[in-house]
From Swiss-Prot:
Lineage, broadest ranks: Bacteria, Pseudomonadati, Pseudomonadota, Alphaproteobacteria, Hyphomicrobiales
Record text on subunit structure and interactions: Homotetramer.
Name used for this protein in its record: Nucleoside diphosphate kinase
Family: Belongs to the NDK family.
The UniProt record lists the keyword Nucleotide-binding: yes
Function: Major role in the synthesis of nucleoside triphosphates other than ATP. The ATP gamma phosphate is transferred to the NDP beta phosphate via a ping-pong mechanism, using a phosphorylated active-site intermediate.
Gene: ndk
Pfam families: NDK
Organism: Mesorhizobium japonicum (strain LMG 29417 / CECT 9101 / MAFF 303099) (Mesorhizobium loti (strain MAFF 303099))
Amino acid sequence: MALERTFSMIKPDATRRNLTGAITKMLEDAGLRVIASRRVWMSRREAEGFYAVHKDRPFFGELVEFMSSAPTIVQVLEGENAIARNREVMGATNPANAAEGTIRKVHALSIGENSVHGSDAPETAAQEIKYWFSDTEIVG
């Protein structure tokens, strides 16, 4: 099976609580390798652009506010079936429904402050990676 790349983000609720290392370790322990990583404090404009797919949803304003409230860690992960593997280790969006041992079950505070984001398909992974990284910043 070929290696796959995906986008991952450690959200403000987790960076505020100094969970970057713990979450990255969980990703690496699941067989994912960090091949690009950067700490960013999103502007409102960057958050609106990144989450543009949700612009007509009722939670959009709150999402933008939250994502621009503190630093995030944006990452490119690589591994076998990286998209599915990342989503599995993240757990369900609602931490109450997340499986034991997943990032969201262990670290999330709520459905809104759920610690991590991960791409859901190859197309979104490519778009999300390109939003934050140039090709020269990704070192496999």
